[in-house]
């Protein structure tokens, strides 16, 4: 008989604090879990906010940092591909980036039946080839033809997703519906179908509509404390819409104007674009705060972003770049 593989507890791997999170406070590194909400409660928008953050490295919702960016593999079963693109573009605009900055791959097959062995092998092959850090499947009800209320049918499918997570070292998010009229129940217990969903998740997020335009986001983690609930709303920008945090508390950081002035002053003194890490260090502010203000300044047209970093629109660097482009253009007067 072959003995199981065992090792002393003191030889188990140690995870550094900065490696615990895929998205700080919202989703743990290599965690499986669900986003649960009733229909039309912005859960798909929140899944895409996480996707943009991981795929670009910008803070999720412009405030929750990403320690290390990575590829995202997304399957959106209920939305046409042009709608998925438009939503991604809206979130990118709010984050001060372009859609070409995203390392997101979208599964375009019309169906994805994870209760079929052949489809499972195809998904496994896609993950092997693309090597994403984050897999998002939206929604669960479109991934199978099993009875969601039967634990014996749900458990094997969730076990397959857990197997993918462990074998490939990636995080897995499944968007799932809540039961109708379950407002009095604990968030995890309100998920539709078997209790296996709640037990399966390492990181779970629950969204509850609190008004015509706002929802409340609650998160829980198996191995970390939860943050207080957040109020979110959809905000329109020049390209589309994106979620934003409605912060009714007293700000504990510097007013945006003072940080904006500092960013502009630093960029104005530089002859070259400044990479984000260097700019954040010179600002002496939190990464999430600097990202948030840079996104706002970019939307306002005062700052531009390139692969080399950030520069002031109309500043010395941009004028110099335009001059060099004119010299290279034989048709320039």
Q: Which residue stretches match the model-derived regions?
A:
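C-terminal regions of RecA-like/P-loop NTPase motor modules
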Residues: 128-131, 166-168, 210-333
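Pre-Walker A (P-loop) beta-loop-beta motif of ABC nucleotide-binding domains
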Residues: 29-30
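Short hydrophobic/aromatic beta-strand immediately N-terminal to the Walker A/P-loop
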Residues: 33-36, 73
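Hydrophobic positions on the alpha1 helix immediately C-terminal to the Walker A/P-loop
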Residues: 46, 50
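Conserved inter-motif catalytic segment of the P-loop NTP-binding fold
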Residues: 4, 11, 17-18, 22-23, ...
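Detector for small/aliphatic-rich hydrophobic stretches
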Residues: 1-17, 266, 296
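Phosphate-binding/switch region of NTP-binding enzymes
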Residues: 34-35, 44-45, 134, 152-242
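The conserved Walker
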Residues: 39
């Amino acid at each position: 008989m072959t003995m199981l593989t065992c090792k002393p507890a003191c030889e188990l791997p140690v995870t550094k604090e900065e490696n615990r999170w895929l998205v700080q406070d919202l989703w743990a590194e290599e965690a499986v879990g669900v986003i649960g909400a009733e229909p039309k409660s912005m859960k798909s928008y929140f899944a895409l906010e996480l996707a943009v953050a991981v795929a670009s490295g910008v803070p999720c919702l412009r405030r929750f940092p990403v320690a290390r960016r990575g590829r995202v593999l997304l399957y959106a079963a209920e939305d046409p591909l042009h709608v998925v693109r438009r939503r991604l573009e809206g979130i990118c605009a709010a984050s001060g980036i372009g859609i070409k900055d995203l390392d997101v791959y979208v599964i375009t097959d019309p169906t994805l039946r994870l209760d079929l062995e052949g489809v499972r092998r195809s998904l496994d092959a896609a993950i092997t080839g693309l090597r994403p850090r984050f897999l998002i499947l939206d929604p669960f009800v479109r991934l199978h033809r099993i009875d969601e209320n039967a634990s014996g049918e749900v458990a094997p499918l969730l076990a397959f997703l857990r197997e993918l997570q462990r074998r490939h070292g990636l995080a897995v998010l499944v968007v799932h519906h809540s039961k109708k009229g379950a407002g009095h129940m604990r968030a995890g217990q309100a998920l539709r179908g078997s209790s296996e969903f709640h037990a399966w998740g390492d990181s779970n997020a629950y969204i509850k509509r609190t008004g015509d335009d706002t929802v409340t986001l609650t998160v829980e983690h198996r191995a970390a404390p939860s943050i207080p609930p957040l109020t979110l709303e959809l905000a329109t920008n020049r390209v589309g819409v994106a979620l934003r945090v409605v912060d009714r508390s007293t700000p504990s950081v510097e007013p945006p104007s003072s940080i904006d002035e500092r960013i502009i002053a630093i960029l104005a003194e530089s002859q070259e674009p400044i990479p984000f890490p260097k700019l954040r260090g010179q600002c002496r502010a939190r990464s999430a705060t600097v990202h948030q203000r840079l996104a706002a300044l970019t939307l306002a047209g005062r700052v531009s972003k390139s692969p080399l970093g950030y520069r002031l629109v109309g500043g010395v660097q941009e004028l110099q770049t335009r001059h060099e482009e004119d010299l290279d253009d034989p048709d320039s007067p």
